[in-house]
Curated annotation (Swiss-Prot):
Contains two DNA recognition domains, each specifying recognition of one of the two defined components of the target sequence. This is Putative type I specificity subunit S.MpnORF285P. Keywords: DNA-binding, Restriction system. The methyltransferase is composed of M and S polypeptides. Gene3D superfamilies: DNA methylase specificity domains. The specificity (S) subunit of a type I methyltransferase (MTase); this subunit dictates DNA sequence specificity. The single R subunit has multiple frameshifts and is probably not expressed. The keyword Zinc-finger does not apply. SUPFAM superfamilies: DNA methylase specificity domain, MgtE N-terminal domain-like. Pfam families: Methylase_S (PF01420). InterPro entries: Restrct_endonuc_typeI_TRD (IPR000055), Restrct_endonuc_typeI_TRD_sf (IPR044946), Type-I_RE_S_subunit (IPR051212).
């Protein structure tokens, strides 16, 4: 290094060159600082946007899972338990008042001690029929607006709808065989029944109420089911022999209207407590989504302020 030759101009020229180089070095440092700041800002913005998106997705998935699990488990369980308990109580009340109002002694207490009763076998007051074979293939190939009822107990026994009907008007139907043999329903519409259903049509509607017949039969039908056979069964022959007592038509209708309204409240899928349970579940879903979105927005606002 000591042997390297260096040429020097006069001192005044050396000083001018050194001043120029110092100025250039200073400008270079300033430019480097500005470029560094600008690049840092751009990079920060890009990273912030990318990080925000990634973090938002992670938070969304995490919060959604946690919030959904916690709210659904806690609120849904509490709501379901509360309303289900209420429904059970209403059904107990219904069973109590049904049994009470269909008792001859109680009817006389309410409507008068001299209320007369007449006793008849089902065969004496009803035309008795049975449904026809309607399988799933027939339901698929003949879609329509008219209900088809079978031995099912959910949804009133409805199994589908077709484009024609076998019966029109007031009927009482019962399940002839299977686990639900002896279940009784009131119908008043255009409909059809499968082979697992029997039908009763009141002959004299000026003397007998189909609704009252339905409620009175519900108290007795299960007693006449043959549970000794391989499949429980309540045959047409057997149901025809059931004896029921009837007060005057006016009293029948009053009792039937009370029981029908109470039963509708307890069991109808579009009214009463079951509908309330469904409505509350929809409200739960709404507020759950609302709270989740609110929390998520708050988290994103915090990220943007970083």
């Amino acid at each position: 290094m000591a042997e390297i030759p260096i040429d020097f101009p006069p001192l005044k020229i050396q000083e001018k060159i050194a001043t120029i180089l110092d100025t250039f070095t200073e400008l270079s440092a300033e430019l480097s600082a500005e470029l560094s700041a600008e690049l840092s800002a751009e990079l920060s913005a890009e990273l912030s946007a990318e990080l925000s998106a990634e973090l938002s997705a992670e938070l969304s998935a995490e919060l959604s899972a946690e919030l959904s699990a916690e709210l659904s488990a806690e609120l849904s369980a509490e709501l379901s338990a509360e309303l289900s308990a209420e429904l059970r109580e209403r059904r107990k009340q219904y069973a109590f008042y049904r049994d009470y109002l269909l008792n001859q002694e109680n009817i006389r207490k309410i409507y008068g001690a001299n209320i007369p009763f007449e006793t008849f076998q089902i065969r004496d007051i009803c035309e008795i029929n049975r449904g026809r074979e309607i399988n799933e293939k027939y339901l698929r190939e003949n879609p329509g607006e008219f209900p088809v009822y079978s031995s099912a107990t959910t949804n009133g026994g409805l199994i589908g709808k077709i484009n024609d009907y076998d019966f029109h008007g007031e009927y009482v139907t019962w399940t002839t065989g299977g686990a639900h043999a002896g279940n009784v329903f009131y119908r008043n519409e255009k409909f059809s029944c499968s082979q697992n259903c029997g039908l009763l049509e009141v002959k004299n509607k000026n003397k007998f109420s189909s609704k009252f017949l339905c409620f009175a039969l519900k108290l007795q039908s299960k007693k006449f089911v043959n549970y000794a056979s391989a499949i429980p069964v309540l045959t047409i022959k057997r149901i025809a022999e059931i004896e029921l007592s009837f007060p005057p038509l006016e009293i029948q209708e009053k009792i039937a209207d009370i029981l029908f309204a109470f039963e509708k409240l307890c069991n109808d899928l579009t009214e009463g407590i079951p509908a309330e349970i469904e409505l509350r579940k929809k409200q739960l879903d709404y507020y759950q989504n609302f709270l989740f979105n609110w929390v998520q927005n708050k988290k994103l606002e915090s990220l943007k302020s970083l």
